[in-house]
Swiss-Prot record:
It comes from Burkholderia mallei (strain ATCC 23344). NCBIfam families: PRK05231.1, thrB_alt. It catalyses: L-homoserine + ATP = O-phospho-L-homoserine + ADP + H(+). This is Homoserine kinase. Its EC number is 2.7.1.39. One of its GO terms (biological process) is threonine biosynthetic process. Coiled coil: none annotated. Pfam families: APH (PF01636).
Length: 331
């Protein structure tokens, strides 16, 4: 999250006239992230997040806000979009689509342990199953076609070795995406960006037997219909990684994957192609971080991410493919 479009007190007052949320108590920009303009909004009725969409169009937005509503109705803890006075879930602010959603309980866990990975794995599988009957379709907009368009734009900014890796991995992924194995992988709505800063944890209730409690997943604005295994790979590549080296942390990865498959067991095809999908998940974020780093947009409070982090992860996944754990109950 970031702030590309500033919102004055007068702007906010006019915007809030379309909502039955009481009086504004506090309003401030959120500095993290790189895609939309985001603000914490506190009113006399509760805590919310206002998002101005910098790239998504009004025609694309119903997929995202309706998906959150759908998941919330199916018991998945996600932000619920707040309806305006005309019943719609988003409007226009400074000529761009904008929406208000409820703020989830809890705080991000930026140094996750095994117990956090168990919670995330189980809920990710529940989210995938809950989305099976979601009627709208929107492809993952940061998948293979976007990689093909973006790699030539960033190629002038990287070393010869990096360019060879970018182009070689693009060819590898194109072949993977064209395979019968890929076509047969289970699919549906995916978060596509479930990093550790896009989930919140709250204090566990006493006597539940759990040391942590997942407050929910948020920031669904990179979501799209994709292979569920891609969503799992993106999640594992962030939650279960040794930050200095990019290597997988075996204990956390095993915990997350076993927890996931207690809800939705992996297919034989998913097991066979896990290594390729880990590489796809790493490649997607290396490409996007290179693009955001070398071709940034003007923004207030923008903090671009280090592209080198996902380059290290990609190289690690190429060298060490890994395997999905065998099916048995998660401890």
């Amino acid at each position: 999250m970031a702030v590309f479009t500033a919102v004055s007190d007068a702007d906010l007052a006019l915007w809030m006239r379309h909502y039955d949320l009481g009086d504004v108590v506090a309003f401030r920009g959120i500095p993290s992230g790189i895609e939309n303009s985001n603000f914490f909004l506190t009113t006399t009725r509760g805590e919310y997040v206002l998002t101005i969409f910098e790239n998504l169009t009004a025609g694309q937005l119903p997929f995202y806000v309706d998906l959150m509503s759908h998941l919330a109705k199916h018991g998945v803890p996600v932000p619920a979009p707040v309806a305006r006075d005309d019943g719609t879930l988003f409007g226009e602010l400074h000529g761009k689509p904008a929406a208000i959603v409820t703020k989830l309980e809890g705080a991000a866990q930026l140094a996750p342990g095994v117990e956090h990975c168990v919670e995330v794995g189980q809920m990710l599988a529940r989210m995938h199953l809950a989305g099976r009957d979601y009627p709208r379709h929107q492809p993952n907009l940061r998948s293979l076609p976007w990689w093909r368009d973006t790699v030539p734009a960033i190629a002038p900014f990287v070393t010869g070795e990096q360019r060879a890796l970018l182009e070689g991995e693009l060819a590898h992924q194109a072949a993977f995406f064209a395979s019968d194995d890929y076509a047969a992988l289970p699919e549906g709505p995916c978060h596509c960006d479930l990093f550790r800063d896009n989930a919140l944890f709250a204090h566990a209730e006493p006597d539940t037997g759990h040391s942590v409690r997942l407050g929910g997943f948020f920031d669904f604005y990179f979501a799209g219909c994709d292979k569920w295994l891609f969503d799992v790979a993106v999640t594992v590549n962030d939650w279960c990684v040794d930050l200095p080296t990019g290597a997988l942390d075996a204990a956390r990865a095993d915990a997350l994957l076993r927890a996931y498959q207690t809800v939705r067991p992996f297919t034989a095809g998913e097991r066979r192609r896990w290594g390729d999908m880990l590489r796809a998940g790493a490649y997607r974020f290396w490409v996007s971080r290179l693009y955001d780093f070398h071709l940034p947009r003007a923004a207030q409070m923008l903090k671009p991410h280090d592209p080198g982090h996902f380059e290290r992860i990609l190289r690690e996944r190429i060298a060490h493919a890994g395997a999905l754990p065998e099916t048995h109950a998660c401890n």
